[in-house]
């Protein structure tokens, strides 16, 4: 028997101009005090201000000091800020590190943890449900994600946070930690450094290939993995050749979405992902780069 799980997401807005849907989504959920979580680089580029302007007077505050690999210390700061600002929802603007740190915060808040409670053991203990159930506590705070990379973290209910003291990555999650709404606007990726954007596109190829090769792959995961790889293989060279090509960026975002359908549905990953978690948590190597290096080597090993 094969079982495919669907994430507890309501809507995905995709394409040029999709960011304009954000105020209507705030209205739909009745959020009066959303907290904006982003990065310092997106503040410097002006992208964070563009999103903050859409939030208007409702914006409860902004947190921007989210380092790569979502350290536990960042999760603790987010938990504290959410309480201090009396926020009622979250808008996460950024890549996988921002979105995963926000997932960690949502897991902690759902379990009633305070900032001082945030340890690796406490956060993994608060995680539950995986992809097997949506749960029943729909009073939990939720996230709207505006991705600026191609990591596809916005389509899963789980994420990686780093215990810097131990030098390892921890997987945390809850069915309702997945963003309830995703806004894929290619213009939101224009300020992302080329190396980061292109390497996270390679990470999506890694999702596709390892998902297709997984022993518990399904017809759904196979179909989406093949189409994701085809689209990304076409989009990445076009993005590299013309950084202003929004059609190529939109195709890459669609490919990222497709690439993670197997993983978010319960399909296992392979050694490239596993080694990537070790390198990321222990040595702060970006996951996009670990995929570029490890996937070819893992495939050669698997093919023997």
Model regions and ranges:
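ATP/NTP phosphate-donor binding region
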Residues: 1-89
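A glycine/threonine-rich phosphate-anchoring loop and its flanking beta-alpha core
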Residues: 20, 24, 110-219
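Short Gly/Thr/Asp-enriched flexible loops that form oxyanion-binding sites at enzyme active sites
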Residues: 48-51, 78-79, 98-111, 156-157
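Acidic, glycine-rich active-site loops and adjacent beta-strand->loop/helix elements
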Residues: 69, 97, 105-109, 122-123, ...
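Acidic-glycine-rich active-site phosphate/pyrophosphate-binding loop
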Residues: 79, 175-182, 266-273
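Glycine/serine-rich anion-binding loops at beta->alpha junctions
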Residues: 87-105, 148-153, 285
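Active-site segments that bind and position negatively charged phosphate/pyrophosphate groups
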Residues: 211-304
């Amino acid at each position: 028997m094969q079982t495919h799980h669907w994430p507890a997401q309501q809507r995905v807005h995709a394409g040029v101009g999709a960011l304009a849907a954000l105020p209507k989504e705030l209205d739909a959920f009745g959020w009066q005090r959303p907290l904006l979580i982003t990065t310092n680089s997106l503040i410097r580029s002006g992208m964070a201000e563009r999103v903050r302007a859409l939030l208007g007077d409702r914006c409860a505050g902004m947190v921007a000091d989210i380092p790569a690999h979502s350290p536990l210390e960042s999760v603790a700061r987010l938990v504290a800020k959410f309480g201090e600002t009396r926020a009622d929802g979250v808008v996460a603007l950024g890549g996988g590190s921002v979105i995963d740190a926000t997932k960690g915060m949502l897991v902690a808040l759902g379990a009633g943890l305070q900032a001082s409670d945030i340890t690796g053991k406490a956060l993994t203990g608060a995680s539950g449900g995986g992809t097997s159930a949506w749960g029943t506590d729909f009073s939990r705070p939720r996230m709207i994600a505006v991705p600026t990379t191609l990591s596809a973290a916005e389509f899963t209910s789980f994420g990686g946070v780093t215990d810097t003291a131990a030098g390892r990555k921890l997987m945390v999650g809850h069915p309702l930690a997945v963003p309830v709404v995703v806004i894929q606007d290619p213009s939101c990726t224009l300020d992302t450094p080329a190396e980061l954007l292109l390497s996270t596109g390679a990470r999506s190829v890694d999702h596709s290939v390892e998902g297709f090769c997984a022993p518990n792959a399904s017809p759904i995961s196979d179909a989406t993995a093949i189409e994701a790889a085809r689209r990304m293989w076409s989009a990445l060279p076009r993005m590299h050749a013309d950084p202003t090509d929004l059609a190529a960026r939109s195709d890459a975002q669609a490919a990222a979405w497709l690439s993670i359908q197997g993983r978010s549905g319960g399909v296992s990953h392979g050694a490239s992902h596993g080694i990537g978690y070790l390198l990321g948590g222990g040595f702060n190597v970006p996951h996009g780069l670990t995929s570029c290096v490890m996937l070819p080597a893992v495939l050669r090993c698997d093919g023997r």
